[in-house]
Amino acid sequence: LNQFVSHLVQREDALFSNLATRTNGNYDKKVKKRLQDLPDQFSYEKLEEIATAEAKVKTNNNDLGISNHFYNTRLKMKLKKLKGFQKNESYVQSPEYNDLQLVLDQFAKSRTNVIFVIPPVNAKWMKYTGLSQEKYEQAVQKIRYQLESQGFTNIADFSKDGDQPYFMEDTIHMGWNGWLAFDKAVNPFVTKAEKAPTYHLNDRFFSKDWAQYKGTPDEFK
């Protein structure tokens, strides 16, 4: 398990090592020149105006609320073939629920206070591809039950926001106003000190029964 977690950390380091900081060239190229676009005084309302204005320009070549770049490079040429392709898709049954439990187990052992973010799916994309809203919400409830029943109660759940204007950048990733909502939800968690949590793990979440369970989560035995 420790080896697994070490691997996760290495992957995380690799992922974030190129992010812009004041000590590398990316700061000047990717951050400094954009600072002039920000309001002089911090304001979510003003930031939302800026985000919305930018999003309108960058999503103006399609009806899905998806960035022009993503649409042009990933969807445009095959869009017709993708219509209805997710009508039989479901995330309710998956071995990844067991994988999640492995991560929770390590967090509990280290008494790490964490916040989980549940992103939405682009509602227009969901409708176009036929992805079941009911099954999607069922998967979200299953995830939430696995977390909350074991004491992982810090959850930023945006699963119902996939239809909000300019909330998404593509099919499944949050965009302009989505990141503002993310900041509002996560900022209190990272800025306020909290006591180390106490978790109550249930090893039944490691079982194949749970991975394949389709019923009401709190009725799982």
Predicted regions and their residues:
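Secreted/periplasmic serine-hydrolase-like ester/acetyl group-modifying domain
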Residues: 1-108, 203-221
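Alpha-helix initiation/capping motif
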Residues: 10, 94, 122, 163-167
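A glycine-rich, aromatic-flanked flexible loop/lid motif
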Residues: 69-77, 112-121, 158
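A generic short-segment signal for beta-strand/edge and adjacent turn/coil regions
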Residues: 82-86, 123-126, 155
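Charge-dense, low-complexity intrinsically disordered segments
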Residues: 90, 94, 130, 173
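A structural motif corresponding to the C-terminal end of an alpha-helix
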Residues: 101-115, 143-154
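Active-site segments of SGNH/GDSL-like serine hydrolases
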Residues: 106-131
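C-terminal regions of proteins
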Residues: 132-135, 139-221
